Amino acid sequence: MSKLHIKKGDTVYVNAGEDKGKTGRVLKVLVKEGRAIVEGINMVSKSTKPNAKNPQGGIVKQEASIHISNLNPVDPKTGKATRIGRRKSSEGTLVRYSKKSGEEI
């Protein structure tokens, strides 16, 4: 599997699927499955039994995972979807940068 271009906390643009065109923040990355959970994207209804948090139970909306091939990071400078590159910083560590603007992410 190739390196993932998405990390927790990134703002991403959805480029395919039911939520195409929306942006959201990555809450969790599922590395082995190649999927990510994005805030407010791919919402599903889930039935829950009554518990201490929700004494009534019922139907709850929550985010489902989405494949990372359907996500693009958002350029911090322009606010549009971009591709990601990696380059060495002056300290010698690899940093991610936007291919469109050259800005570090």
UniProtKB/Swiss-Prot annotation:
Species name: Bacteroides thetaiotaomicron (strain ATCC 29148 / DSM 2079 / JCM 5827 / CCUG 10774 / NCTC 10582 / VPI-5482 / E50)
GO biological process, one term: translation
UniProt function note: One of two assembly initiator proteins, it binds directly to the 5'-end of the 23S rRNA, where it nucleates assembly of the 50S subunit. One of the proteins that surrounds the polypeptide exit tunnel on the outside of the subunit.
Upper lineage: Bacteria, Pseudomonadati, Bacteroidota, Bacteroidia, Bacteroidales
Domain of life: Bacteria
Stored InterPro entries: KOW, Rib_uL2_dom2, Ribosomal_uL24, Ribosomal_uL24_KOW, Translation_prot_SH3-like_sf
Self-association and partners: Part of the 50S ribosomal subunit.
Region (Disordered) location: 67-105
PANTHER family linked: MITOCHONDRIAL RIBOSOMAL PROTEIN L24
Recorded name of the encoding gene: rplX
Identification of the protein by name: Large ribosomal subunit protein uL24
Sequence similarity: Belongs to the universal ribosomal protein uL24 family.
One Gene Ontology term, aspect cellular component: cytosolic large ribosomal subunit
Keyword Zinc (UniProt): no
GO molecular function: rRNA binding; structural constituent of ribosome
Assigned keywords, A-Z: Ribonucleoprotein, Ribosomal protein, RNA-binding, rRNA-binding
HAMAP family in alphabetical order: Ribosomal_uL24_B
